[in-house]
């Protein structure tokens, strides 16, 4: 009952006593004094309590009667009575008295009132024990106080706050989980009335509430926390201002002394926000201020707090308070690392609880995914993956893209987290399909990306990819049918690079299995020095295939010792790597070996971990005979149309083709698993299919696995032979090759079989029907290579009479004059395809013979050289198209390179033929350069080619296409590292060292560059700069480390060459001078790049006698062949642009029909000023621009390029001077063959212009030179100077032509130096030079 609601009595109650001056007690109650016993006192008090309980406010007489008693009960005797029951009964009486006498209290003294209420408050502690017999009376006391709001009378007291604080503390301390809701409600009523009806809440009172929200208190008494929470919710309107004042004092003014809770402000804000965000309406702006604090730790605390506020599930703070949200996002870029880390950790909860904020977070996470701190990049991945695992819809493609990027992070921990995270997503959404097809489609790229990582050099990456494949992409613990279905459709849906990576993975695992098998074989042999040396080498090889090869070596040695001592362990390992080991057996073996090596006393056993890595790599956990059978059944279902191909997102044709490709790859690594009639029957069915690729793969599988068909499966053999014969005679070229090899591999009577193919094919060759020639030529070539003893002689007549005389030396058809230097495979004419196969046949025939007794190799090399010199047009009848010539040049260069892999033929390849072959890497056709470089690298990296062929890569410095130069550099790095590693692993004699030590490439490179057709004048600075760039292209890679004083060794080689003569032309002084000049440039580069080359070389290098004569006695060559000025120019002058070769297929102007220089200023696509061309500095700039443009792409060019020049208008210029000028003579006399230095280019739209130009060209133009061009043209004698008129008509017939810099990009424009005299005169009179602008920009 509210005091204010009660009517005041007619007379004042205070001080009124009974008429006789004695205290009136209720009937039956005797006087209560200190003279009676406690029990008696309790008995009498109970009756008093009953009387007061039954009284109401309207009983005026009774109120008057019992007033003395009310005053008596408030005496010190009762308030300080030691008996708690007495105190409880008195408190109940007092509570009723306040109720009865409301709104006035019968007590006038403020001190007395304070004592009474403190007394009552102390009695409320009895509420704590609900099992107490007196609990009901305590509850009655609470109920009475709450109902009447008795404590509100204390507002009149000056120090009422002490009472309220004591009350609040008491109630919060006694509340517990045994109280029912009524107790809590009465407490709430009591406290809320004090808060809401008072003049304000003091800090101490507020502390008594807020302290219950602090985590430590919250954990001790959950009920007090709940009570405080409900109280705050109920009083939010009143208490909000008090809370705001508190936080303002602490956060803004820094007055932490205002409260003992100051150090818990952030915990309190979090709890208050969770209770009711309205409690903090005025506090949030203060947090924004704190986010910008100069103290990093303070910012960190605020970020932690706001992360919880923004990230909590029901929070709408981000939308309600955008300024604070934006300010918080800014902390993602905080300078303090822990703040950025905390921000990133928050993002995970935010993404999961507030997907609508993902857009805001994406940009900030993008920046943090590139954070310099490893921990932050790692946590970005964890954040995104955690959210994605909860629900893929929570993360957008961009966020997943950040994880994708981090799979290539420089730190292993980050890469591992990214890869494992993606793998888990793939398994969850693609393999298990937990969120439907749409989600599976969203992450379908993961499988490809993870497999692409197998291309990385790090062994850790490779091992993790293997683990991911075995556990996530195709889980090895699935049943065989399910596992193979998973693999079948995975393989069909992978992109080509991922397929290659997966194939490489199986290949590496198989190779490691073979290393372990060879190690076990060595254990079976008697101990010897050779055996120990071989075993050590094998252990080092195995260690390289494990993480941390340094530590792995020790562990592998230890494992090898255990193998030597434990025969049972060896047998387990032999079973594991046995071709017949099943997947289940493999699992048992791995567990058994691990159990034997485990040490119970050593919980972390790095040795065991390393052995497990090895076992996991070699164990056949996916493929066995049962698995192959399941794969074949799946493929059969696809053929029959009963498979789930479409449902799995793969077309039946793709499934069949990919399935067979998969089987083909597995036939290399697990051939034994294929040996069953059922499998071979299915493969025979594939052989009869119309799909050429399917049939080809089936033949390959027979070739790899069919060694026992003849003895074990005669029925399969009888069916297979006629099919193979038919494929060898009339199948595709690839089928024919595989069919011949298959017959040779699996049949004992192969001579008879091959003869039945050879004889009819050799008799039916007809050059007039080239489309029917290709397959027979492939079959004949491979037959002669596989069975040289039987077919070498009959093939000789075929080669002489048909291949060379009839096919290669005749052009039966006229090529399409489309101006392109390269055409797609399907557009190449059958005749040229036949000629390419004829060249390959010559090589295969010679590779089969492996001797040069008949001098056939010399004849073949001369033929191939002639083809290179004639640019692919061997007959020189000009009937063949440019693109066909490119094909034939590539075939000829590749053929020489192939023959060089056979020692007997390498010896007879002359330096001139080697140089011609080398210049193919500078061909004008981009695709020729590209394919030739790939073939060269492939042979070098397998150590099949002699070291001199690595020198060819030096010429790649002249390639204008950045990608080609980068590829060449990577090839050099790979080759050099492989050779050095091979030398480390295989100690060898000095003679063999000459062919492997990478530094020995220097003399070959020097000799090759000295004979470069572009190097015509040994003192020309531009030409020397080209030489320097080529030398540095190679030397930069060689000089990365100064291993074994290699810098001094290379310097010594160059010095020694100056003491010899060029073996190619020992008596030609000009040739030797060029050789010595290149040596001086090399010495200049080595000395300038290394301070370590002045020491003496520990070894005296041996120079190849094929290229250099023996040093003459007493011959001293200390002459410097480059001047000091030139030396300075080479080292400190403006760097020579790399772009000196055609990046695209833009041929040089050919004899016969020549390009025209159009001087009209009306043509579009030109912005070149003639003066610019004549200005050397402008020319250099234009070359650099052209070179840069080249790096943007590759395109095809026209056969007759048109150079379009826009001349700046000048007064008094005769219009006649702007007419079309035939640049034929200028081109022959003045265009440099410096692979693009001022070379003609087709402007944008030149394909259309060319047709018009062809119509305008005077067909009776200058006659073709009497002698055709051969190879590259040398640099013009007048390079860099004005063209001399008397040189214009001189034909240039020496060297292979190089591509032009103008070929660098489609529509590129260049400033050629082929200028007609009139244009030059015009340029001299023209206005000041304008800056040349590359149209590509």
Curated annotation (Swiss-Prot):
Bias (Polar residues): 1159-1180, 1223-1233
Repeat (HEAT) residue spans along the chain: 393-429
Residue numbers of N6-acetyllysine PTMs: 1146, 1211, 1290
Sequence segments annotated as region (Disordered): 1150-1337
CDD domains: PDS5
Keyword Signal: no
Basic and acidic residues: bias regions: 1321-1337
Key words, A-Z: Acetylation, Cell cycle, Cell division, Mitosis, Nucleus, Phosphoprotein, Repeat
Subcellular location: Nucleus
Purpose: Probable regulator of sister chromatid cohesion in mitosis which may stabilize cohesin complex association with chromatin. May couple sister chromatid cohesion during mitosis to DNA replication. Cohesion ensures that chromosome partitioning is accurate in both meiotic and mitotic cells and plays an important role in DNA repair.
Miscellaneous information on this protein: HeLa cells with a reduced level of PDS5A show a mild defect in sister chromatid cohesion. HeLa cells with a reduced level of RAD21 show reduced association of PDS5A with chromatin.
Protein name stated in the entry: Sister chromatid cohesion protein PDS5 homolog A
Native species: Homo sapiens
Protein's gene: PDS5A
């Amino acid at each position: 009952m509210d005091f204010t609601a009660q009517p005041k009595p007619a007379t004042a109650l205070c001080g009124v006593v009974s008429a006789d001056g004695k205290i009136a007690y209720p009937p039956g109650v005797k006087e209560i004094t200190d003279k009676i016993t406690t029990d008696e006192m309790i008995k009498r008090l109970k009756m008093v309590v009953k009387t007061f309980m039954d009284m109401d406010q309207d009983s005026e007489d009774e109120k008057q009667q019992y007033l003395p008693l009310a005053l008596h009960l408030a005496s010190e005797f009762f308030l300080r009575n030691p008996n708690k029951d007495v105190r409880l009964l008195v408190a109940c009486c007092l509570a009723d008295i306040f109720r009865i006498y409301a709104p006035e209290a019968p007590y006038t003294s403020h001190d007395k009132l304070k004592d009474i209420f403190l007394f009552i408050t102390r009695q409320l502690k009895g509420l704590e024990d609900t099992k107490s017999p007196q609990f009901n009376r305590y509850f009655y006391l609470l109920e009475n106080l709450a109902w009447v709001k008795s404590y509100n009378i204390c507002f009149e007291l000056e120090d009422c706050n002490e009472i309220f604080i004591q009350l609040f503390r008491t109630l919060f301390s006694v509340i517990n989980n045994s109280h029912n809701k009524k107790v809590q409600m009465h407490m709430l009523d009591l406290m809320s009335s004090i808060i809401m009806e008072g003049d304000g809440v003091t800090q101490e009172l507020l502390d008594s509430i807020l302290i219950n929200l602090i985590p430590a208190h919250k954990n001790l008494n959950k009920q007090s926390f709940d009570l405080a929470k409900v109280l705050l919710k109920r009083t939010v309107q009143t208490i909000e201002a008090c809370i705001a004042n508190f936080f303002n004092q602490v956060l803004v003014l820094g007055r932490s002394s205002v409260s003992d809770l100051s150090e818990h402000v952030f915990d309190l804000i979090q709890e208050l926000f969770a209770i009711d965000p309205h409690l903090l309406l005025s506090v949030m702006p203060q947090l924004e201020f704190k986010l910008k604090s100069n103290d990093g730790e303070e910012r960190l605390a605020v970020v932690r707090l706001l992360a919880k506020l923004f990230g909590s599930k029901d929070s709408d703070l981000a939308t309600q308070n955008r300024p604070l949200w934006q300010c918080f996002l800014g902390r993602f870029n905080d300078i303090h690392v822990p703040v950025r880390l905390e921000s990133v950790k928050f993002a995970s909860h935010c993404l999961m609880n507030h997907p609508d904020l993902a857009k805001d977070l994406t940009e900030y996470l993008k920046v943090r995914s590139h954070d310099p701190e490893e921990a932050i990049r790692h946590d970005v991945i964890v954040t995104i993956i955690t959210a994605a695992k909860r629900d893929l819809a929570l993360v957008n493609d961009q966020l997943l893209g950040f994880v994708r990027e981090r799979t290539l992070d420089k730190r292993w921990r980050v890469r591992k987290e990214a890869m494992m995270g993606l793998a888990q997503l793939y398994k969850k959404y693609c393999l298990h399909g937990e969120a439907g097809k749409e989600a599976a489609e969203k992450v379908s790229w993961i499988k490809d990306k993870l497999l692409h990582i197998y291309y990385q050099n790090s062994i850790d990456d490779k091992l993790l990819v293997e683990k991911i494949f075995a556990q996530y992409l195709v889980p090895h613990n699935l049943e065989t049918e399910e596992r193979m279905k998973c693999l079948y459709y995975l393989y069909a849906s992978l992109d080509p690079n991922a397929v290659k990576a997966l194939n490489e993975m199986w290949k590496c695992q198989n190779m490691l299995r073979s290393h372990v098998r060879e190690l076990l074989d060595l254990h079976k042999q008697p101990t010897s020095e050779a055996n120990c040396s071989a075993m050590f080498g094998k252990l080092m090889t195995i260690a390289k295939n494990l993480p941390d090869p340094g530590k792995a070596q020790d562990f592998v040695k230890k494992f090898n010792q255990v193998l030597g001592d434990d025969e049972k362990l060896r047998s387990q390992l032999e079973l594991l790597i046995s071709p017949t080991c099943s997947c289940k057996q493999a699992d048992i073996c791995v567990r058994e070996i691990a159990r034997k090596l485990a040490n119970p006393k050593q919980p972390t056993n790095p040795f065991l971990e390393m052995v497990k890595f090895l076992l996991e790599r070699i164990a056949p956990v996916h493929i066995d005979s049962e698995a192959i059978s399941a794969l074949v059944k799946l493929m059969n279902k696809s053929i029959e149309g009963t498979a789930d191909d479409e449902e799995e997102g793969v077309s039946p044709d793709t499934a069949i083709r990919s399935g067979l490709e998969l089987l083909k790859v597995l036939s290399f690594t697990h051939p034994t698993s294929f040996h069953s009639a059922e499998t071979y029957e299915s493969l025979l069915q594939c052989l009869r299919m119309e799909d050429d690729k399917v049939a080809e793969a089936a033949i390959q599988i027979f070739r790899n696995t069919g060694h026992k068909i003849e003895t074990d499966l005669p029925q399969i053999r009888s069916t297979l032979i006629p099919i193979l014969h038919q494929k060898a005679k009339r199948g595709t070229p690839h089928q024919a090759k595989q069919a011949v090899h298959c017959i040779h591999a699996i049949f004992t009577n192969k001579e008879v079989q091959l003869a039945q193919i050879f004889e009819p094919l050799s008799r039916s060759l007809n050059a007039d029907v080239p489309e029917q020639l290709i397959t027979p030529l492939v079959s004949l070539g491979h037959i002669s290579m596989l069975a040289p003893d039987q077919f070498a002689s009959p093939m000789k007549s075929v080669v002489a009479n048909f291949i060379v005389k009839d096919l290669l030396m005749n052009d039966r058809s006229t090529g399409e004059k489309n101006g392109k230097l390269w055409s797609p495979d399907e557009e190449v004419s059958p005749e040229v395809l036949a000629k390419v196969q004829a060249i390959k046949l010559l090589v295969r025939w010679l590779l089969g013979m492996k001797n040069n007794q008949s001098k056939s190799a010399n004849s073949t090399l001369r033929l191939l050289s002639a083809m290179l010199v004639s640019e692919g047009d061997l007959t020189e009848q000009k009937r063949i198209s440019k693109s066909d010539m490119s094909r034939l040049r590539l075939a000829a260069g590749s053929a020489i390179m192939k023959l060089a892999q056979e020692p007997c033929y390498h010896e007879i390849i002359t330096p001139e033929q080697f140089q011609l072959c080398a210049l193919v890497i500078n061909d004008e056709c981009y695709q020729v350069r590209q394919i030739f470089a790939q073939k060269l690298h492939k042979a070098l990296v397998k150590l099949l080619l002699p070291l001199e062929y690595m020198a060819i890569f030096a010429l790649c410095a002249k390639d204008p296409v950045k990608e080609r130069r980068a590829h060449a550099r990577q090839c050099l790095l790979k080759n050099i590292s492989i050779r050095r590693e091979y030398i480390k692993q295989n100690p060898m004699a000095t003679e063999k060292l000459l062919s492997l030590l990478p530094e020995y490439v220097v003399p070959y490179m020097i000799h090759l560059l000295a004979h470069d057709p572009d190097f015509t004048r040994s003192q020309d600075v531009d030409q020397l700069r080209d030489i320097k760039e080529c030398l540095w292209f190679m030397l930069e890679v060689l000089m990365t480390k100064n291993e074994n004083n290699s810098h001094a060794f290379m310097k010594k080689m160059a010095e020694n060459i100056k003491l010899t003569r060029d073996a190619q032309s020992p008596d030609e002084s000009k040739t030797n001078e060029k050789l010595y000049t290149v040596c001086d440039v090399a010495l200049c580069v080595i000395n300038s790049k290394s301070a370590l080359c002045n020491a003496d070389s520990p070894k005296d290098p041996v120079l190849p006698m094929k290229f250099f004569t023996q040093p003459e006695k007493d011959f001293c060559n200390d002459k410097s062949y480059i001047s000091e000025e030139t030396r300075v120019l080479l080292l400190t002058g403006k760097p020579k642009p790399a772009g000196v070769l055609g990046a695209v297929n833009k041929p040089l102007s050919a004899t016969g029909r020549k390009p025209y220089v159009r001087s009209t200023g009306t043509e579009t696509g030109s912005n070149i000023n003639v003066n610019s061309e004549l200005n050397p500095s402008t020319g250099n700039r234009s070359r650099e621009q052209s070179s840069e443009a080249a790096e943007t792409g590759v395109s095809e060019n026209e056969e007759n390029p048109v150079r379009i020049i826009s001349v700046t208008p000048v007064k008094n210029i005769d219009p006649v001077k702007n007419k079309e000028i035939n640049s034929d003579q200028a081109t022959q006399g003045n265009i440099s063959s410096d692979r693009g230095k001022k070379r003609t280019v087709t402007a944008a739209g030149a394909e259309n212009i060319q047709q018009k130009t062809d119509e305008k060209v005077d067909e009776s133009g200058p006659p073709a030179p009497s002698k055709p061009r051969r190879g590259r043209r040398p640099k013009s004698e007048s390079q860099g100077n004005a063209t001399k008129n008397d040189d214009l008509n001189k034909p240039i017939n020496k060297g292979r032509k190089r591509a032009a810099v103008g070929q660098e990009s489609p529509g590129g424009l260049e400033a050629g130096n082929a200028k007609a005299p009139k244009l030059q005169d015009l340029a001299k009179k023209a206005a000041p030079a304008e800056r040349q602008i590359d149209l590509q920009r």
